[in-house]
UniProtKB/Swiss-Prot annotation:
Entry-linked InterPro entries: Reprimo_fam (IPR043383)
Subcellular location: Membrane
Residues passing through the membrane, by range: 64-84
Organism: Mus musculus (Mouse)
Annotated keywords: Membrane, Phosphoprotein, Transmembrane, Transmembrane helix
Domain of life, source organism: Eukaryota
Cellular compartments per GO CC: membrane
Cell membrane among keywords: no
Gene from which this protein is expressed: Rprml
Protein name: Reprimo-like protein
Amino acid sequence: MNVSFLNHSGLEEVGGDARATLGNRSHGLGTWLDCCPGGAPLTASDGVPAGLAPDERSLWVSRVAQIAVLCVLSLTVVFGVFFLGCNLLIKSESMINFLMQERRPSKDVGAAILGLY
């Protein structure tokens, strides 16, 4: 079924009348774009969308603030985990190197083995 926003052929295939449902089929892209005036400002001087009521404006501002805070917190967590992991990796490498140095045989053991021959 090939149905898109501007193609009404899918409704006719099902049995409905596309003209009765969605209007005249001769409407093109220009008709859809002419529904909104191009000269209207999209945002007010403070950056909030222009067509909002005062209650909606305060809700929008609070949502934007929540999104900003969550972004900062998530970045803090991501970088904290990254740097903690790097720090633990560096410490584990130094501990492995420390253990490798401790497992070398001492010079006394080598002298004792050579003394037996």
